[in-house]
Amino acid sequence: MSFSPQEALHRTIEHGEIFFDEMVDLMRQIMRGDVSPMMTAAILTGLRVKKETVDEIAAAATVMREFARPVPVADTSNLVDIVGTGGDGSHTFNISTCAMFVAAAAGARVAKHGNRSVSSKSGSADALEALGAVIELQPDQVAAAIDRTGIGFMFAPIHHPSMKVVAPVRREMGVRTIFNILGPLTNPASAPSVLMGVFHPDLVGIQARVLRELGTERAMVVWGRDNMDEISLGAGTLVGELRDGKVREYEIHPEDFGIAMSASRNLRVDGPEQSIQMLRAVLDNEPGPALDIVALNAGAALYVAGVASDIGDGLARARAAIANGSARQRLQQYVETTRALVA
């Protein structure tokens, strides 16, 4: 007998936990469109108010992965996702998108999962499109891009078509729900390592433990104390690191890596064009906080991907990839490859 939406709603109202198998059953019903929009909204609200547990999030992510269109990557060694939940309200340029090119040029392979802007001035899809890349690639084309360039961008609407069932509900609700934290957990290429930024400090430990439940090998979940879903230059950054099946929580600071502190306002942009200008300046090795934050985040990605021995080593590799022009070349190679794949 399936777990009824009514029971789920009652459980959340009473601040009770929905167990893993129950949540799997419930999410399948929601993703199939078997639960009414009104009931779906009520359940999502109940989960948000009581705060989602590790098991609830892991179960929901498991079902989203079931319903996704997977990317057939034959070799996932050194494959990493650099992703953020968004919603931090910082309106910075596309740091993780820029870090993707740097990390790939420095030896990692990146399978980035993203979408258009929801809360920021420029989402990863918006930035890549402005750079001239084709973002609406099919799963086999993304796999080919990874094989040829070490980079693949998975545009969420193509890989998660079943999300259209809940899209109207989410849009009408207009508040964060569990779906805001599921996207970064549902990489269609099954990247074994992840650098994930989150919008709230409570999610640092939670998301790291969810990733462990989902079988991720290595991960860093980060939240900057200046409310950035990146490793920040403006304050300390809380880290939940998953390694060898254990989650360790700690804090890092830019000074730990010889980087001067800089307020996030120095990285803010008004839209995709300004974001692209800043991204290109970084890849042209223009000194400043934009280059520093990209190199630091790319360095962390290289660490979790197993390319670097620690973040400091990753930072050095990232800076070298920017300075020698290979990161800029990787951007151009990626843009040309995506165009060729659809020609």
Curated annotation (Swiss-Prot):
Q: Which Gene3D superfamilies match?
A: Nucleoside phosphorylase/phosphoribosyltransferase catalytic domain, Transferase, Pyrimidine Nucleoside Phosphorylase, Chain C
InterPro entries documented for this protein: Anthranilate_Pribosyl_Tfrase, Glycosyl_Trfase_fam3, Glycosyl_Trfase_fam3_N_dom, Glycosyl_Trfase_fam3_N_dom_sf, Nuc_phospho_transferase
Write down the chemical reaction(s) this protein catalyses. Answer: N-(5-phospho-beta-D-ribosyl)anthranilate + diphosphate = 5-phospho-alpha-D-ribose 1-diphosphate + anthranilate
Is-annotated flag, keyword Metal-binding?
A: yes
Which cofactor names does the annotation list? Mg(2+)
List the Gene Ontology MF annotations in alphabetical order: anthranilate phosphoribosyltransferase activity; magnesium ion binding
A Pfam family annotated for this UniProt entry: Glycos_transf_3
SUPFAM superfamilies linked to this entry: Nucleoside phosphorylase/phosphoribosyltransferase catalytic domain (SSF52418), Nucleoside phosphorylase/phosphoribosyltransferase N-terminal domain (SSF47648)
The residues that hold anthranilate 1 are: G84, N115
Q: Name one cellular component (GO) term.
A: cytosol
The alphabetized list of GO BP terms reads: L-tryptophan biosynthetic process
Pathway(s) where this gene product acts = Amino-acid biosynthesis; L-tryptophan biosynthesis; L-tryptophan from chorismate: step 2/5
Q: Quick one: which residues bind anthranilate 2?
A: R170
**Top-level class of the enzyme under EC nomenclature:** transferase
Please verify whether the record's keywords include Glycosyltransferase: yes
Keyword annotations: Amino-acid biosynthesis, Aromatic amino acid biosynthesis, Glycosyltransferase, Magnesium, Metal-binding, Transferase, Tryptophan biosynthesis
- Cofactor: bound how, per the entry note? Binds 2 magnesium ions per monomer.
PANTHER family to which the protein is assigned, alphabetical? ANTHRANILATE PHOSPHORIBOSYLTRANSFERASE
Recorded family membership: Belongs to the anthranilate phosphoribosyltransferase family.
* Protein name per Swiss-Prot or TrEMBL: Anthranilate phosphoribosyltransferase
Species whose genome carries this gene:
Stenotrophomonas maltophilia (strain K279a)
Q: What is the lineage of its organism?
A: Bacteria, Pseudomonadati, Pseudomonadota, Gammaproteobacteria, Lysobacterales
